[in-house]
């Protein structure tokens, strides 16, 4: 069974998401940005969501985690929760 591991940053606006992504792309630490800005409780852990299986996350989030490149920050990804930056850290098939 497939699994993925990821970390994310959840914010309320696409603009804020883009600004934070630019900071990360420029070398800012993902975990520190998550701790400072994420609306998700996982922000306290650097955005780490641990391991999960297909279908455990909302569709838009799931699609990134099980189809996109590992080790790259993806986003903004819009879900019913807000806007995410997602980094898939591992995946098994």
What are these regions (language model features)?
Residues 16-17, 26-27, 92:
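N-terminal targeting/tethering segments
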Residues 19-21, 49-52, 74-78, 91:
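Noncatalytic linker/hinge segments flanking ATPase motor cores
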Residues 20-60:
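Peptidyl-prolyl cis-trans isomerase
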Residues 1-10, 60-93:
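Proteostasis/folding factors centered on peptidyl-prolyl cis-trans isomerases
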Residues 16, 57, 84:
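Short phosphate-engaging motifs
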């Amino acid at each position: 069974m497939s699994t993925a591991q990821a970390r994310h940053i959840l914010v309320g606006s696409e603009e804020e998401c883009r600004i934070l992504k630019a900071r990360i792309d420029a070398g800012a630490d993902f975990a520190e940005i998550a701790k400072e800005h994420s609306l998700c409780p996982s922000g306290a852990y650097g955005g780490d969501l641990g391991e999960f299986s297909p279908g455990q996350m909302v569709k838009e989030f799931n699609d990134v985690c099980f189809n996109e490149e590992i080790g790259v920050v993806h986003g903004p990804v819009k879900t019913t929760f807000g806007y995410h930056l997602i980094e898939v850290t591992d995946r098994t098939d």
